[in-house]
Amino acid sequence: MKLKAKYKQQSKVGKVVQVVSAVVDVSFAGKDLPHILNALECTINNEKIVLEVLQHIGDDIVRCLAMNSTDGLFRGAEVIDTGEQIKVPVGKSILGRILNVVGQPIDDLGPIKCDNFSQIHKDAPKFINQSTSRKILITGIKVIDLLTPYISGGKIGLFGGAGVGKTVLIMEIINNVAKAYKGYTVFTGVGERTREGGDLYKEMVGSNIIDLNKLENSKVTLVFGQMNEPPGARARVALTGLTIAESFRDMNEGEVLLFIDNIFRFTQAGAEISTLLGRIPSAVGYQPTLATDIGSLQERITSTKFGAITSIQAIYVPADDLTDPAPVACFAHLDATTVLSRKIAELGIYPAVDPLNSSSQILDANVIGQEHYSVATQVQEILQTYKSLQDVIAILGVDELSDDEKRIVSRARKIQRFLTQPFHVAEVFTGKQGRFVSLEDTIYGFKGLIEGKYDDLPEMAFYMVGSIDEAIEKSKTL
């Protein structure tokens, strides 16, 4: 009866006729069915279950996707059509809060007082309203700033298999960029570990990005649909986080940072839903609508004349296969890609970024400057030459190389080690204080390496240091 009172405006009332995991069929009398993507609500044991209409089946049945657990749901349960799509609170009232997929707070800080709500399904901004930026976003991480510079207002993907450091890297970027950032930040946890979300929240409270005493002074909103949640939550929570980021962008108060960890779980949830709906799977078992699902999300992550969204997304690579359809569907949408390699991680090189597989659209002399471009391309050439010589070294040994090749190998190994860096978020594991390296120091250090200024220093002097001055000091202790 409470639900009926809430939706007086000719609400449609239906009955549950079938429950199959997260997919629920609801029957409505008459032929006036709820629209596709409408939100339906059902209360079981004082818990509200939110359903989203996906299909019309026959004359009187709609097939829905549950946003939360269907435990306790039964045939005959009463369902109310809200008459609108899922809407979530937006604006400054949600700063410092943790929300779930339907915009409910899950941080035990009480209800959210908000008058502004926005639906999670939207079209991308019109082309005439979009804007582009060619400005570099400084992360303080040498390998990224030098070889795969990130675009302010662009889309960035961190690709990698299990356990190679995607989450640690995204946490370090949050630490280096979001803490010093004047705009707003939205972190969206999609199908990842609840523990990591808790650690991130505590870190943000500790660094005062979230001000528990005065939440409106906070600079971040967190949205979680973690791996223990139904596929409906994991498939829609990225849209919830994006909707909140869009609202901050359209407030015209500067750039917005949007972190998503992990886009693959969004794809994975879509595959689960597709199977439950009985669709014929495509390659490797993914949903036949894979490209559409990814495209509808990615095309909304864009900058407009009102403001910019800079998106940094972690993307899991199944079995370390970059040709898997899920990561392949993401590549075309991104402005910069950072590929993490297990082979590099096995060498103890952290962050385990593959400098030859990673790329950026703004690695261009007209954008980043001639000196930066020249140093970056020479570093890549040296590393590529070293890679091509590795088979010869493995069979014949270093002694069979020419003097020039030996010099290149020596510099390449030093460059490889100088690309490492101690992270602030990993201090508890490494015991080493994190380093933020300015772009000027990064270019200066690598320029000296490729010119041979530091040929006399041992390789280990360059391992896990910040600037080149630190490497010189370290060499004195070896």
From Swiss-Prot:
SUPFAM superfamilies: C-terminal domain of alpha and beta subunits of F1 ATP synthase, N-terminal domain of alpha and beta subunits of F1 ATP synthase, P-loop containing nucleoside triphosphate hydrolases. Pfam families: ATP-synt_ab, ATP-synt_ab_N, ATP-synt_VA_C. F-type ATPases have 2 components, CF(1) - the catalytic core - and CF(0) - the membrane proton channel. CF(1) has five subunits: alpha(3), beta(3), gamma(1), delta(1), epsilon(1). CF(0) has three main subunits: a(1), b(2) and c(9-12). The alpha and beta chains form an alternating ring which encloses part of the gamma chain. CF(1) is attached to CF(0) by a central stalk formed by the gamma and epsilon chains, while a peripheral stalk is formed by the delta and b chains. ATP binds at residues 160-167. PROSITE patterns: ATPASE_ALPHA_BETA (PS00152). This is ATP synthase subunit beta. It comes from the Bacteria. It catalyses: ATP + H2O + 4 H(+)(in) = ADP + phosphate + 5 H(+)(out). One of its GO terms (molecular function) is ATP binding. It comes from Orientia tsutsugamushi (strain Boryong) (Rickettsia tsutsugamushi).
